[in-house]
UniProtKB/Swiss-Prot annotation:
Binding-site residues for ATP, renumbered to this chain: G476, P477, P478, D479, T480, G481, K482, S483
Organism lineage: Viruses, Monodnaviria, Shotokuvirae, Cossaviricota, Papovaviricetes
Gene transcribed to yield this protein: E1
Any single GO CC term annotated in Swiss-Prot or TrEMBL for this entry: host cell nucleus
Chain positions covered by the region annotation DNA-binding region: 186-352
Ranges where the SF3 helicase domain occurs: 450-600
Keyword tags: ATP-binding, DNA replication, DNA-binding, Early protein, Helicase, Host nucleus, Hydrolase, Isomerase, Isopeptide bond, Nucleotide-binding, Phosphoprotein, Ubl conjugation
Protein name stated in the entry: Replication protein E1
Length: 646
């Protein structure tokens, strides 16, 4: 195959590029002979016409051009080195490389500027390989120069090799470095909107990994998880990626007016600015509200935000916020949250006390809590102001403490109730109620055609537990107010309710052991038959034995018992043995209501309190008091402090 024109003897003498330039300079109409002696042309020196620049340049101008070129090359080299070494800390939006690239690319050489290597493609791979080697610690002390084989197509050269000089090779490498560094700066630009985040399958894991890389601690080590976006909280921790620096400067000032405490930290990475903040809002907000507010203020999409409430019981998390708030990289405003202060400041550490069950029992007794759920919930609510409650929350035996506290409160309440007489108990219950009006109760009895004198006489014997008068039954048609009357009285006296539905169990009467008064509502024929067979002695008000679950039999005197029924045993002779043991009052009239559906006669605790106070002398409920008045103190179940005198 014949060689292409102008490609012989490549590497010796003039290169192929200069031969092509000589052919182009010929006139269009000139004809080149095939048997032209190429050696003669080389000897004549016509191919070297444009090789030497005969332009007269003054010494001062030549020196100025050299200095300008040297300055441009040094600026380029310094910028590239600075970008490689400190690319993590340099703002990706303003770089000296971007300012110097257009001028340097043209000032290196006018002839070199006309050359396009590889059809205008930029060599990116060499720079990335060099950066990877330097990041890994290898190849940092040597500069690898790899010559690229340039292919020729149709006699048109695409590159320069070998013999055309080392200066062109060095200048070409400088252009490559400039183009590569420009690509790196372009990748660091925030205008890409962190495209890499959208390419990964697990976005949350990618963000958490980048967060730990930047701040040295995992995001989930600082927060607790809220599964629902509707859960409200005053304290929130959020991390935001890809924030514009111009917006980041005024973020703290914008949000400070809405928060009681605000802690912000900013750092940079190849994704842009990254924000970590702890904020205590003036009002509780849910996650949807916080995310919507941050996305609007910082101009970022929702998937670039991680928002969770902070860990309040983690000493490590509290120490992180405390230590980072003392550094120059954080901006803090407002009062430090108490959960940080308690876990980091010495005075709070010294003030921590061990949990005391007696203090918890005293609190439950003073506030009238005997149910386990109420004790656990309300005692946890005062952990901010009570040191013992805070120690209770830190304990791993909270359930055990709650059970023990409820059991002790019930024991104290039961002993207190048994110690009191019926008059003292009614007075004790009346102290917990307001003062009402006794007349609605009397009017209701008159409305039901009950003689007040007879009712008060029976009520006095019933309250004092006189044998054969220890049970009162209210009978009548439905909707006459029998159950309403009895339930209101039981609520005021804090009595217990028993039900015949549990009669199949041997323990259905067990609650009578710990009761001051009791009530059995809606006694049917089966219940009357059961009472006539098994409960005659109980209705008498005499001592009887009650079976208790997991305990031995208890011998008790039946408390005053109130019954309601639609069956009047006075009219049935088969209950003749119960007629002498049960005092019967009949409610014949329907219970009255006004036009709004409210009861005409209000049966409240306040009205019952006024009723017993008004008729205390008739019911013989006077309590014995000293001449100076009552001097008893509230029960105290915590150990006192012994004062030692010198």
């Amino acid at each position: 195959m014949a060689d292409d024109s102008g490609t012989e003897d490549v590497g010796s003498g003039c290169s192929g590029w200069f031969l092509v330039e000589a052919v182009v300079d010929k006139q269009t109409g000139d004809v080149v002979s095939e048997d032209e002696d190429e050696d003669a042309i080389e000897d004549s020196g016509y191919d070297m016409v444009d090789f030497i620049n005969d332009t007269v340049v003054s010494e001062h101008e030549e020196l100025s051009n050299a200095q300008a070129l040297l300055h441009a090359q040094q600026t380029c080299a310094d910028a590239v080195e600075l970008c490689e070494l400190k690319r993590k800390y340099i703002s990706p939006y303003v770089s000296p490389i971007q300012c110097s690239e257009p001028s340097v690319d043209g000032d290196l050489s006018p002839r070199l500027h006309a050359i396009k290597l590889g059809g205008g493609k930029k060599a990116k791979r060499r720079l990335f390989e060099r950066l990877e080697q330097r990041d890994s610690g290898y190849g940092y002390s040597q500069v690898e120069t790899t010559e690229t084989q340039v292919e020729e197509e149709h006699g048109e050269p695409e590159g320069i090799e070998g013999g055309s000089g080392r200066a062109a090779t060095v200048e070409t490498e400088a252009v490559e470095v400039l183009e590569e560094s420009s690509d790196v700066i372009q990748q660091l630009s925030p205008r890409t909107q962190v495209v890499e985040l959208f390419k990964c399958k697990d976005l949350n894991a990618k963000l958490c990994g980048k967060f730990k890389e930047l701040f040295g601690v995992g995001f989930h080590d600082l927060v607790r998880q809220f599964k629902s976006d509707k859960s409200t909280c005053t304290d929130w921790v959020y991390a935001v990626f890809g924030v514009n620096p111009t917006i980041a400067e005024g973020f703290h000032t914008l949000l400070k007016g809405q928060a009681l405490y605000l802690h912000t930290q900013w750092t940079t990475c190849r994704w842009g600015m990254v924000l970590l903040a702890l904020c205590r809002y003036k009002v509780a907000k849910n996650r949807e509200t916080v995310v919507r507010q941050l996305a609007k203020m910082l101009n970022v999409p929702d998937n670039q935000l991680m928002v969770q409430p902070p860990k309040l019981q983690s000493s490590a998390a509290a120490l992180f916020w405390f230590r980072s708030g003392m550094g120059n990289g954080s901006e803090v405003s407002g009062t430090t949250p108490e959960w940080i202060a308690k876990q980091t400041m010495l005075e709070h550490s010294f003030a921590e006390a061990q949990f005391s069950l007696t203090q918890m029992v005293q609190w439950a007794y003073d506030n009238g809590h005997t149910d386990e759920c109420e004790i656990a919930y309300y005692y946890a609510q005062i952990a901010d102001i009570d040191a013992n409650a805070a120690a209770f929350l830190k304990s791993n035996n909270q359930a055990k403490y709650v059970r023990d506290c409820a059991a002790m409160c019930k024991h104290y309440r039961l002993a207190e109730m048994r110690r009191m007489s019926m008059a003292d108990w009614i007075k004790h219950r009346g102290e917990k109620c307001d003062e009402g009006d006794w007349k609605p109760i009397v009017k209701l009895l008159r409305y039901q055609h009950i003689d007040i004198i007879v009712f008060l006489a029976a009520l006095k014997k019933w309250l004092h537990g006189i044998p054969k008068k220890n049970c009162i039954c209210i009978v009548g048609p439905p909707d006459t107010g029998k159950s309403c009357f009895g339930m209101s009285l039981m609520h005021f006296l804090q009595g217990t309710i028993i039900s015949f539905v549990n009669s199949c169990s041997h323990f259905w009467l067990q609650s009578l052991v710990d009761a001051k008064v009791a009530m059995l509502d809606d006694v049917t024929s089966a219940c009357w038959a059961y009472m006539d067979t098994h409960m005659r002695n109980l209705l008498d008000g005499n001592p009887t034995s009650i079976d208790r679950k997991h305990k031995s039999l208890a011998v008790i005197k039946c408390p005053p018992l109130l019954l309601t029924s639609n069956i009047n045993i006075k009219h049935d002779c088969k209950y003749q043995y119960l007629q002498s043991r049960v005092t019967v009052f009949e409610f014949p009239n329907p219970f009255p209501f006004d036009s709004n559906g409210n009861a005409v006669y209000e049966l409240s605790d306040a009205n019952w309190n006024s009723f017993f106070k008004r008729l205390a002398s008739s019911l013989e409920l006077q309590t014995t008091e000293d001449e100076d008045g009552e001097t008893s103190q509230a029960p105290r179940f915590v150990p006192g402090t012994v004062v030692r005198t010198l």
